[in-house]
Amino acid sequence: MSNVTSVMTANPACCTPQTSLRDVARMMIQNDCGQIPVVDDQNAPLGVVTDRDIAVRIVAEGRDTNVACAADAMSSPAQTVREDSSLKDAVCLMEAAKIRRVPVVNASGRLSGIVSIADIALAGKKTATAEVVKEVSEPGSARA
């Protein structure tokens, strides 16, 4: 079975905990994605900000979006897979954590990519993807 590097999006947009949510949202628009990894100064993932995190943790709570930053909305710690992880390992993590995207880290723990259900589906792993979509889409799913 292929590993995650064969299907991941390499060098994804990322931000720091101090990045304004307005800038995070702009990154999502510019990169046509719903998740931005939050990294430290060594580019190691600390967490992720999803469009759902912004809606639920900031907007729905009535917090000021003009002063909120990535750290205020991020899901942490980041669930990650290593570059040498199999697609099956990524699917299992997505299913267990009820997530649709997983940051990929290199041997040093630095962000190198993101793998998503869509990436796996496009790679022809439709059976595994259908099962993950079913699992993460059930009512009560924790996060997008």
Model-found features: residue ranges?
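Tandem CBS (Cystathionine beta-synthase) repeat/Bateman regulatory domains
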Residues: 1-144
